[in-house]
Amino acid sequence: MKKVRFIFLALLFFLASPEGAMASDGTWQGKQYLKEDGSQAANEWVFDTHYQSWFYIKADANYAENEWLKQGDDYFYLKSGGYMAKSEWVEDKGAFYYLDQDGKMKRNAWVGTSYVGATGAKVIEDWVYDSQYDAWFYIKADGQHAEKEWLQIKGKDYYFKSGGYLLTSQWINQAYVNASGAKVQQGWLFDKQYQSWFYIKENGNYADKEWIFENGHYYYLKSGGYMAANEWIWDKESWFYLKFDGKIAEKEWVYDSHSQAWYYFKSGGYMAANEWIWDKESWFYLKFDGKMAEKEWVYDSHSQAWYYFKSGGYMTANEWIWDKESWFYLKSDGKIAEKEWVYDSHSQAWYYFKSGGYMTANEWIWDKESWFYLKSDGKMAEKEWVYDSHSQAWYYFKSGGYMAKNETVDGYQLGSDGKWLGGKATNKNAAYYQVVPVTANVYDSDGEKLSYISQGSVVWLDKDRKSDDKRLAITISGLSGYMKTEDLQALDASKDFIPYYESDGHRFYHYVAQNASIPVASHLSDMEVGKKYYSADGLHFDGFKLENPFLFKDLTEATNYSAEELDKVFSLLNINNSLLENKGATFKEAEEHYHINALYLLAHSALESNWGRSKIAKDKNNFFGITAYDTTPYLSAKTFDDVDKGILGATKWIKENYIDRGRTFLGNKASGMNVEYASDPYWGEKIASVMMKINEKLGGKD
């Protein structure tokens, strides 16, 4: 090909392009053209009707040939023989150019599936952005745009749709192309349209129905490539759980809100089932369906034993469980106690558990070639008398719980069957009796229950009323009534301790037990210092009547002490490590809300919980002995969530069960709260004593 020459003409003619030229009937003379008027053509276009083509006659009067002509912003190409190129490709210096039907070189335009750039040259192996279509295209080596195919360009794969458009931010089968159009090769991808994560593998396809290990965690990609999250997957003969972030649950607990149960997933993510898990310093059991055992019994076939799992799934050990209307005991290894003896260090007593683990109560047990008796609270009778209503006889159980027989105990003869040969354990000449059972009822003359009193309490024989072999007329803590003879044991006032009162010249004390006394009032002038006084009601004495300032105080009246003053009590009385310390505001809140005296509430809680330091207080936030029954105080005591709820919840309970029912003062066994709240006949007196002590320390405002 001839070297291309660009002709830059400063045209002086009106005619600037072939479109404006006219056909001529002139003649050719070699490379020159004579027009119809005989003049020679120069610097102008000529259209030859014979050749049906345009020619350009240069200034030297020869036609342009194998060269470019620029007119204005347009380029034309004159081929060999001078013919103007049109509607065709022209190759020049290894590049291809396209001349349109008017002979103009096309630029920045599509020619079929090819594209010519700004210079007019056909684009080869390069990207083209078409703003008209707002899309990218790629021109291959053959000059045609890629279409319906993948191309690898500079190490990256791209897909071009029908029409050559570059696919971006879309799926193509199992592959995904990002915003730049490049195929994602490996890694995580979040698709907003599907609101899911996908994982692209090394081959460029998404993971489908398979596990992926990434950054130390396993993930599962479901059918369609969707990442499993907050859901269960059954695989490898086991259940697995994928958490909210898609990670497999492993060596951890998961709560499933649908089944409302906890599950544990072992190493590798396998769901634990029919097996034990040690965690949080406790054993847990995962049942056959994987659910954590909770508030239920589980039989383990391997150890052939029953276990109980508490709230939270913790295995019960060294604890009591109330279930099926019976107490059960779980030993240190969690196994249910069954057909065996158990010593409870807290109650310092032995218990026997029958087949099935049921606690024995009010029953005889034959063991070690001897009879043993389990009382109503399940405790083994030891070093004590027991009345058996079935055989209507008294028995004595020695140290170790062995039933005594063919021997004399405390002067009483026992037969070969263990029965006391002397009949009833009463002495009609005795003035005082002691309560034998854990609790015993006091009845009116018609047999209706009046109150109940605790084991060891001393009652007075009321000689003004008639007693018989079945019941004795008694009086205690202001209450007169009758008690079953089988519940009482005669005392010898010359040898046995009988509760009494005594003044030291400053305080008047009630000695309720050997070396145990409580101040109940200030010294009165009518009192003789050092003299023992006896009273059946704690109010009337020989020569004077006692006025206890708080025993009959109306507890619906507010105290005169503030929360801050109540808080000072602990330092004034040198009381440390108390859960009730700095809870004056809570006691005052209870007073305001439930209209119960805050000083009384503090004193009551102090008595029942040893100033907030008892085991029941620490373990259960129970400071008022709520449902702490005499037979099972710790086990039956109600549990509160925290200290404040323990105070407020108990106050509400006291209001509903006592204050609202007219028992608005502490009282004794004849009237007031003491009638039913506690079996201790001096419970009210003891709380009143604490109130008196606090009142004195705080200045006597009440």
From Swiss-Prot:
Protein name: Putative endo-beta-N-acetylglucosaminidase
Annotated gene: lytB
Compartment list: Secreted
A single GO molecular function term of this UniProt record: amidase activity
PANTHER family, per database record: PEPTIDOGLYCAN HYDROLASE FLGJ
SMART domains, alphabetized: LYZ2
Biological role: Plays an important role in cell wall degradation and cell separation.
Position of the signal peptide: 1-23
Cell wall biogenesis/degradation in keyword set: yes
Cell wall-binding repeat positions: 42-63, 65-84, 86-105, 124-145, 147-166, 185-206, 208-227, 229-248, 250-271, 273-292, 294-315, 317-336, 338-359, 361-380, 382-403
UniProt keyword Calcium present: no
Enzyme class at the top of the EC tree: hydrolase
EC identifiers of the protein: 3.2.1.96
InterPro entries listed in its UniProt record: Cell_wall/Cho-bd_repeat, Glycosyl_Hydrolase_73, LytB_SH3, LytB_WW-like, MGlyc_endo_b_GlcNAc-like_dom
